[in-house]
Regions:
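Bacterial N-terminal signal peptides
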Residues: 15-31
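Short intrinsically disordered, low-complexity segments
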Residues: 7, 29-34
């Protein structure tokens, strides 16, 4: 996809790149040539799944400094794909509900798009698959995704240390766990430093 981006557009992980990736996944799912590409939830459906019907959603983007990037990568034990962090805040009737981040990662050879829902206390509440462009046998089940949720040490989100494997899906497990750790570490570093 990067070959189709205009010069000057930040690649891999920038808010525009993530949006374009999500739209590309939607188009790929609509193509008769891409029978295995599957969009599971549109963005508005995902936000409703995260915060419930009637929530007000606002988008925020933070620039990540080189010092913050180093701290996030050390905490997450993975590399960041962007120097920007885009997240959404959900509110209903003035009450803060939490955060959501839409991320995309290459699993084996194709893109998966997922959303990480985080409480106001920075605990992962849900991980929701939005699009999965690999064969269905590599797609994690909802019960597997629940391993990524809850208040647990970051090392428990590392494959082989706290996550059960998915037979034949090591790259899927690695991609999703890397993404969730990066989101969680980004919140811990960026929001605790001064929201």
């Amino acid at each position: 996809m990067e070959a189709y981006l205009p010069k000057g557009i930040q690649r891999s992980g920038s808010p525009l790149y993530l949006l374009l990736s999500f739209l590309l996944a939607l188009c790929a799912a609509a193509s008769p040539l891409a029978a295995r590409a599957e969009v599971l939830l549109a963005q508005d459906e995902a936000m409703e799944a995260a915060f419930g019907a009637g929530a007000t959603i606002t988008s925020n983007t933070k620039k990540i400094s080189s010092e913050q990037k180093a701290a996030i990568e050390e905490l997450a034990q993975t590399k960041l794909t962007s120097s920007f962090f885009q997240y959404y805040e959900g509110r209903r009737n003035g009450e803060f509900l939490g955060y959501a981040v839409i991320d995309s990662r290459v699993m084996r050879t194709n893109l998966a798009v997922f959303m990480v829902v985080v409480s106001k206390d920075l605990v992962v509440q849900k991980v929701i698959l939005l699009a999965f462009n690999e064969p269905s046998e590599y797609q994690p089940t909802d019960s597997w995704l629940t391993q990524l949720e809850g208040p647990k040490p970051m090392q428990d989100l590392v494959p082989g240390q706290g996550l059960a494997p998915i037979a034949g899906s090591t790259l899927t497990v690695n991609g999703l766990s890397d993404g969730v750790r990066a989101v969680r570490a980004s919140f811990e570093v960026l929001l605790k430093e001064g929201k």
